[in-house]
């Protein structure tokens, strides 16, 4: 596996400009999102069986159909949205497949009522926006694009595996000094390597005395200020409805367990992960677990109320149970669709490690809080 020499030179230039090192977050920003060269910018064909990783969307259309039913029957009936148009705002849409599945399900299941739902994709990348426009062309003006989150949203802001794709900082515990030290990236002996940065540790990471004495030297923890900031902006934009993400992640205290001493950041290629995180910029996916505690906190600070905070399996089963009360409004269950649902909910697939975090302006009409 060879990486782009142009991308390597751009990262090296950033390191030189930064005084000899950059944060891991800056390295990831270039390796993943540099126009035409970054991992997420090169091709839409990185997801699925023939790509580097699978997602709930790549399992098939069922995931989008279930979300469409939930949007119509829960979000569309929530406080402030029971009448009038409902906007669906998706961020991190990649090639637009989830949007396609959701829109097709809404048009098929809602009939004329489906016209109250309009779809917006927030996409800052011109490359990815072109992929999405090609896939969604047949929906015409029912789909619109913007580079940034709109100032006011009445409906649902949703994402699937978006927050885990934000760049992260990497911090190591210095047991002798009893403090966190940020690790950055520099160029050494013709390769990228780790180096300590003189960055003050986050104040919220002050550890209790009993944990300071047992946390092993070199214990790694990541944080993603950009993911938390994105959630805060989305929460501020939500005027009525729900802000929801489906992703893999942990609560704050779970990051400090013995099994995660090397952190959660992984490099993926062809459904395998690599321990060497810095060797193949632009050729591998770099992803870390979401800190749901930090994300949820900024939503609450913005005035949102809890809707869901549960495993993806339970959330989808709840939607499935609701579809049984609406005969004829959901497609019949073929063998293929049953297998897809099992993949989405089984503990060995997407059921255990993936979680749903949803917060809203107003209570959840299905009685969840």
Language-model segments: what does each one mean?
Residues 1-153, 171, 314, 328, ...:
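Rossmann-like AdoMet
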Residues 146-150, 163-179, 223-233:
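A short, conserved alpha-helix within the catalytic core of class I
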Residues 93, 162, 246-250:
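Short, well-ordered beta-to-alpha junction loops that form the rim of enzyme active sites
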Residues 158-211, 258-268:
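A mobile, often basic/glycine-rich helix-loop segment
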Residues 6, 23-26, 58, 62, ...:
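Generic recognition of stable, solvent-exposed alpha-helical segments in well-folded globular domains
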Residues 204-369:
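Long, Lys/Arg- and hydrophobic-enriched amphipathic alpha-helices
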Residues 154-155, 241:
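Conserved acidic residues
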Residues 31, 157, 295:
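A residue-level signal for conserved active-site and pocket-lining positions in enzyme catalytic cores
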